[in-house]
Amino acid sequence: ATVKVTLIKSVTGRIPNHKLXVKGL
């Protein structure tokens, strides 16, 4: 799970739009 969170954080950090989508979920 920690690895997934790290990957998600890395992606969200690069793509602000993705971060919003993740927050919505």
Swiss-Prot record:
Subunit structure: Part of the 50S ribosomal subunit.
Family statement: Belongs to the universal ribosomal protein uL30 family.
Chain's gene name: rpmD
Alphabetical UniProt keywords: Ribonucleoprotein, Ribosomal protein
Disulfide bonds: none
Name of protein: Large ribosomal subunit protein uL30
Record bears the keyword Transcription: no
Organismal lineage: Bacteria, Pseudomonadati, Pseudomonadota, Gammaproteobacteria, Pseudomonadales
One GO CC term, this protein: ribonucleoprotein complex
Keyword hit for Ribonucleoprotein: yes
